[in-house]
Amino acid sequence: MNSGRVFFLKQVRDGSSGTFESEARGLEELRKAGAVRIPEVVAQGPDYLLLEWIVEGKESKDSCMEELGFQFAKLHHFSGEIFGFPEDNYLGDSLQSNSPSKNGSINWPTFYVENRLQFQASLAVKNGYTNPELQNLLELLYNKIPELLSGTEDKPSLLHGDLWSGNYLIDKNGRPWLIDPAV
C-alpha cells in the first residue's frame, strides 16, 4: 500500500549493538518534552530506524541559532532526579554509560567525569587508542573538573547529548529539527 508519505531509513548490516533502539528511545524522550522539533519514529528494529522525512530548506543553519537556543533553554527545564538516563546508550557507535555516579553523588561534575570522560577513556585504553602520557594528563583533568565546574549547581535535565552541526537540520520553513541524539 502506498500512503504517499516519504520516510528516512537508517540501516546497518548487523544490528546487534542496540544503537537504533537507543536512538529511538532518545528521540521519543526529546519529542515528549515538546521543546524542540524532533522527527517522528515511525518504526525501529535491531538493524533499522525509520523516521519521518523532513524536507530540508535552503537557509543557512546559522539563520536559526537564536530559535534553537531558546528551544534548548526550554528543553533544559525538563528535570530528572539524577544525572544520566535510565539506560546506557550510544554516542555514534561508542557505548555511553548513563548509570548514576558510583560514589552516589548526584552532581554534574562527578557524573561528567565518571560517565563521560573516564568511561570513554577506558574504552580508548581497551581499544589501544591511548598511552600513559595521555592517561596521566586525563587524571589531572579529572581532578580539576570539580573545581572548574564548582558553583554551577546544575540540576539534572534532558540533554541531546551529541549536538554538533551534523545533528540538526533546517526544514523548508526555516525551522530547526534535532536528529541523532545521545541523551
Label each residue range with its predicted role.
Residues 2, 34, 163, 172-174:
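A generic beta-sheet turn/junction motif
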Residues 2-110:
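ATP-binding pocket architecture of kinase catalytic cores
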Residues 6, 48, 156-158, 176:
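Hydrophobic "anchor" residues on beta-strands that sit immediately upstream
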Residues 16-18, 46-51, 59, 118-119, ...:
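Helix-rich C-terminal or lid/interface subdomains of diverse kinases
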Residues 27, 112, 163, 180-181:
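Generic structural signal for small/hydrophobic residues in well-ordered secondary structure
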Residues 80-158, 171:
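An alpha-helical support segment within catalytic cores of ATP-dependent transferases
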Residues 157, 162, 167:
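Conserved catalytic-loop position in the HRD/HxD motif
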Residues 166-183:
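Catalytic activation segment of kinase domains across protein kinase-like and atypical kinase folds
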